[in-house]
Amino acid sequence: MALPLSGTRHLTRALLSNVTLMAPPRIPSSVHYGGSRLGCSTRFFSIRCGANRSGSTYSPLNSGSNFSDRPPTEMAPLFPGCDYEHWLIVMDKPGGEGATKQQMIDCYIQTLAKVVGSEEEAKKRIYNVSCERYLGFGCEIDEETSTKLEGLPGVLFVLPDSYVDPENKDYGAELFVNGEIVQRSPERQRRVEPQPQRAQDRPRYNDRTRYSRRRENTR
């Protein structure tokens, strides 16, 4: 069954938290990439569904999907923070090869400024930035404005955002307020950081399987 547009936001963030997007990843047919927007099903392995064809665009306001026909207020209880006013913009090599963190952030600001009118306005609208686990930023804009980001140099994905920490209405990454990075309290920071996989959560083989494999390796 297809997932709602925002349904794979958490899958996307999990993937991004483990991969630095220095080059475009292998993209399945369901993402909006390099200027064409995702359909409404899944992200990365269903990043927002529908087939992605060159030049096609998607809007949750005009999609025929049963999920995307639901207004944001209906989707919010399932994916807190997904209101189509907060967007995650993932970029490829912001600031160029070997850019410093500040150069990346400057690139984020300059990119958003192209659709909101000025760098000062862009600084007000960017609420988080990421320069390590993935390369991109979160910004508060309406859906129509978000479509204008598609196809801009360096923009890989334009994705509806959702909370990493719903209790504090926090979208994760590094907080960005009026052009400056703001530190969270240690407690809040722990809530948005990716948690290391626990040993008991890792897949394990039973003793018979391990014994069988040891025998095969000795042949």
Curated annotation (Swiss-Prot):
The keyword Transferase does not apply. GO terms for biological process: cytidine to uridine editing; endonucleolytic cleavage of tetracistronic rRNA transcript (SSU-rRNA, LSU-rRNA, 4.5S-rRNA, 5S-rRNA); mitochondrial mRNA modification; mRNA processing; plastid organization. Involved in plastid rRNA processing and consequently in translation and early chloroplast differentiation. Involved in organellar RNA editing. Required for the processing of multiple editing sites in plastids. InterPro entries: MORF/ORRM1/DAG-like (IPR039206), MORF/ORRM1/DAG-like_MORF (IPR054059), S8pro/Inhibitor_I9_sf (IPR037045). Keywords: Chloroplast, mRNA processing, Plastid, Transit peptide. Gene3D superfamilies: Peptidase S8 propeptide/proteinase inhibitor I9. This is Multiple organellar RNA editing factor 2, chloroplastic. Disruption phenotype: Small plants with white leaves that do not contain chlorophyll. Mutant plants are unable to grow autotrophically on soil and flowers are sterile. Residues 182-219 are annotated as: Disordered. It is found in: Plastid, Chloroplast. GO terms for cellular component: chloroplast; endoplasmic reticulum; mitochondrion. Residues 1-48 form a transit peptide. Its main location: plastid. The gene is MORF2. Homodimer and heterodimer with MORF9. Interacts with protoporphyrinogen oxidase 1 PPOX1. Heterodimers with MORF8/RIP1 and MORF9/RIP9. Interacts with PCMP-A2/PMD1. Interacts with ORRM1. Interacts with ORRM6. Residues 185-219 have a biased composition (Basic and acidic residues). Belongs to the MORF family. GO terms for molecular function: protein dimerization activity; protein homodimerization activity.
